[in-house]
Amino acid sequence: MELGDLLVAVPLGLLAGALAGLLGIGGGLIFAPLLLWMGLSPHQALATSTFAIVPTAMGGSVTHLRQRSIPWREGLILGVSAFLSALLFSRLGRLADGWHLLLLQSVMYLVLTVTIRSEEVEAASDAVAPLPLLGLGGVGVVAGLAGGLLGLGGGLVMVPLMVRTLSVPIRLAIRFSSLAVACSASAASLQFLVEGRGQPSMGLLLGGTAAVAAQWSASRLDQVRPGLLATLLRALALLLALDSGRRALQLALQMP
């Protein structure tokens, strides 16, 4: 990594970490485009992004665990299902072309822009009803898909999914998401290391920087209105849908 790249990567890493701790994402929404801009191929960028997500998500998760704000049984089921499914999906990523992965990202983000409503989240209660363990296991599989196949943490998918389908309060969904992202990214990173994909040192440098900001923002999650959290999630999803779609189209047009 050259000095110019470093001067760009460090502040963007801090931004990724701040968003990760606040929204329960892994930071891949910033890491992946940054690594593509730095010249990595889509497969290499997505693998390196996964390496960066590990310390980023762990930074937020450690804060939530210290505060004892994650129910242990539900968190364990979510984390284990995310870890195991990421091992599976990380093997499948090699079978797809780079533009296929980017197109899948774009479609996923577009769906998210209409799945969560700020007004519904604002009106929802913070009281926690008994959570369906099977449903949380399914959310963990979604995290594994995002982390293993797409090189994303999956928080932008999991948080709306838990809020809309499982009626999980958005702050708790964000905490669950941070834990699931850490587990799925860890599993996918192990597979990528075995296969020799990505650049671990670059990923850990980005992630280590982001982890500092993730711990800071995660500790302040309760100070942010639920409606604002939902609005931020939707705005990021729309922005990334457009960017991923543009990159997918460029790669598809370059193919012989």
Language-model regions, residue ranges each:
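Transmembrane alpha-helices of multi-pass small-molecule transport proteins
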Residues: 48-63, 112
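Juxtamembrane transmembrane-helix boundary motif
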Residues: 1-16, 34-38, 42-43, 62-146, ...
